[in-house]
Swiss-Prot record:
Localization per record: Cytoplasm
Family label: Belongs to the DnaJ family.
Binding site for Zn(2+) 2: 165, 168, 191, 194
Subunit structure: Homodimer.
Organism this protein belongs to: Crocosphaera subtropica (strain ATCC 51142 / BH68) (Cyanothece sp. (strain ATCC 51142))
GO CC annotation, single: cytoplasm
Pfam families: DnaJ, DnaJ_C, DnaJ_CXXCXGXG
Coiled coil: none
J domain ranges (all copies): 4-68
Protein name, per record: Chaperone protein DnaJ
CXXCXGXG motif repeat spans: 148-155, 165-172, 191-198, 205-212
Entry's Gene Ontology molecular function annotations: ATP binding; heat shock protein binding; unfolded protein binding; zinc ion binding
GO biological process, one term: DNA replication
Length: 376
């Protein structure tokens, strides 16, 4: 005896038609044999189908509510062959399993004759650091499917056409009946002769071999906006695969990967780098030339600059993505080089400086004295 159909779908007896549809979609996706290979999944799937078949139609639902299974047993089990007259039910199946590709196997497959959008494509593109900062144009080569210009996409040799598939009589699907102790069930799959189209080409196009599309490699210029970062995704409209039966072309998605730079790193819109100056430059101050993404720039080192001080070059960072009039800053970390060896003349001068400062340098040497000049 089958279980209670409301319990099978997990709904109460006052469930609306939309509640039933949502429950069915969820359970059918979960237990479909093409998706769920666990033991018992196929039987569970059949129960779900039967429950929805009965409860989705007001007449059969009313009889079931009054008399239980006995009131609907004359239906003889779920019949996939009737799906052509059950538009709503078949539409649910098509919605649920449209993403599985190649049809449902043992479930119901509707013949699709309308336009189908082409597949989207992905391309990974490497940029150097400056290209990511300033953007620009890149020319890439992308292999994709385009509509065959000889047959205009229908796959037939010019001057010929298509005929009704004799295997499925134009239905696009073949059915096989299976008898079980619980009743008869019809299993449906896409027709292998016409791939579910219901028609077969009399003479295939010699250029695309009947596919209606052919593989080509196209040169595409893409614009890289200023300020992109590692992992940024760009969409290039209508540069994916051509659609089927007049469907629109897919899109190309370009994923950007920024290669590390030897000098610069990035923190959002700011560019980071380091310079090393001598202890005398740190004490006395100076002007040095530093590398930036805009070329060499002069940087003023204030007198008494401490190690690891961060100095800022404003508006020399990364442009804001989508508004390159706004830029971040270039932040420069100053490293101070304290020598480990000095010559005699330097030693004499430093000893005089140590005497003036009233600092002893016997313990730890002059290196210790130099280190004491900076606050660490």
């Amino acid at each position: 005896m089958p279980g209670d159909y409301y319990d099978i779908l997990g709904v109460d007896r006052n469930a609306s038609k939309e509640d039933l549809k949502r429950a069915y979609r969820r359970l059918a996706r979960k237990y479909h044999p093409d998706v769920n290979k666990e033991p018992g999944a196929e039987e569970r799937f059949k129960e779900i189908n039967r429950a929805y078949e009965v409860l989705s139609e007001p007449d059969t639902r009313s009889r079931y509510d009054q008399f239980g299974e006995a009131g609907v047993s004359g239906a003889g089990g779920f019949n996939y062959g009737d799906m052509g007259d059950m538009g709503g039910f078949a539409d649910i199946f098509e919605t649920i399993f449209s993403g599985f590709g190649g049809g449902m196997g043992t479930g119901g497959t509707r013949r699709r004759t309308g336009p189908v959008k082409g597949d989207d494509l992905r391309l990974d593109l490497k940029l150097d650091f400056r290209e990511a900062v300033f953007g620009g144009e890149k020319e890439i080569r992308i292999p994709h499917l385009e509509t065959c210009q000889v047959c205009k996409g229908d796959g037939a040799k010019p001057g010929t056409g298509a005929k009704t598939c004799s295997t499925c009589n134009g239905q696009g699907q073949v059915r096989r009946a299976t008898r079980t102790p619980f009743g008869s069930f019809a299993q449906v799959s896409a027709c292998p002769a016409c791939n579910g189209q219901g028609q077969v080409i009399e003479e295939k196009c010699e250029v695309c071999n009947g596919a209606g599309r052919r593989q080509v490699t196209e040169k595409v210029k893409i614009t890289i906006p200023a300020g992109v970062d590692d992992g940024t995704r760009l969409r290039v409209s209508r540069k994916g695969d051509a659609g089927l039966r007049g469907g629109p072309q897919g899109d190309l998605y370009v994923y950007l990967y920024v290669e590390p730079d030897k000098v610069f790193t990035r923190d959002k819109m700011n560019i980071l780098s380091e310079i090393t100056i001598s202890y005398l430059q740190a004490i006395l101050g100076c002007t040095v030339t530093v590398d930036t993404v805009d070329g060499e720039q002069e940087l003023t080192i204030p007198a008494g600059t401490q190690p690891n001080t961060i100095l800022t070059l404003e508006n020399l960072g990364v442009p804001k993505l989508g508004n390159d009039a706004i830029r971040g800053d270039h932040l420069i970390t100053v490293k101070v080089d304290i020598p480990t060896r000095i010559n005699a003349e330097e030693r004499e001068l430093l000893e005089k400086l140590a005497h003036i400062k009233g600092q002893s340098h016997g313990k730890g040497g002059l290196e210790g004295f130099l280190g004491s000049l900076f606050h660490k």
